[in-house]
Amino acid sequence: MSRGLGDVYKRQILSVVTILVIGLGISSCSDYLSVERFFKDRQSEEKIFKSKNFTEQWLAKCYNCLLETNLEITRIGYSTTNFADDMIFNESDGAVTYNAFKFGQYDNTWTNNSYIRCYEGIRQASILINNIDINEELSEVEIADYKAQARFLRSYFYWLLLRKYGPVPLIPEETISIDEDYMDMSYPRSSYDEVVNYISEEMALAARSLPEKRDRQNVNRSTKGAALAVRAKVLLYTASPINNPRPGDSDKFSDFTDWQGRMLMSQTYDES
């Protein structure tokens, strides 16, 4: 009799344990499938730009987009400037080698990431420029400086794109919502002159609020001289025969058009 009761108790205990295990499993599955926890640490743009610390982090991210394939000077094998002279490089380098560039044995895939990083930086800079004025922890001088730095960076990213890809799309400064239709986000290429004029005007505007020099802690940030120097270089390149066809050479870029047949390079010599 007692043995029968013992079996009953065991079955009851086993049933309770089974129910608890199933309940815990359902609960854990519910927690696993819940995505709310992934959004708890996401900040709104308003919260970010009301905070001095978060705003500085946002600006730092803009500068971060100058790294990797956007570096002007870097270690051997990772920048085209490394192959601009007759210095000897180790051919066992795992990246693109000296001879690959010397003999033209490369394609567009090597610099594709630069295109992505530039437009990422352009978007980051535009968002900062459009929102930083709500910050109450920064002084007016700091806000003007941060906006000017972002403006410099945005223009510089376009300069990098122009040098590598020629005429590129100029993205609206109010930025593009990811919720828009794909076709609404597909902006056509702007002409070479349009991109140059944008860079020139934005660099001149940035120079008005940038300081002439910075302290040691901020020595790598943009300055008035940097903005004016980039602007001068852009205009110098634009005035060269490569981009400004001389009389008698007007058909040089006659077939350089977009899908709508719009000319992307000027066909008229500009003395200015």
Task: State each model region's role.
Residues 51-70, 74, 91-165, 183-219:
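Conserved, well-structured interaction surfaces
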Residues 162-163, 169, 237-246:
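Short coil/turn linking the two alpha-helices of tandem helical-hairpin repeats
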Residues 1-9:
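Single conserved hydrophobic/aromatic residue that forms the stacking wall/gate
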Residues 246-269:
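A solvent-exposed, charged loop/short amphipathic helix patch at secondary-structure junctions
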Residues 23-50, 199, 232, 247:
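Bacterial Sec-dependent N-terminal signal peptides
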Residues 218-228:
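Aromatic-lined, polymer-binding surfaces characteristic
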Residues 10-27:
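Sec-dependent bacterial lipoprotein signal peptides
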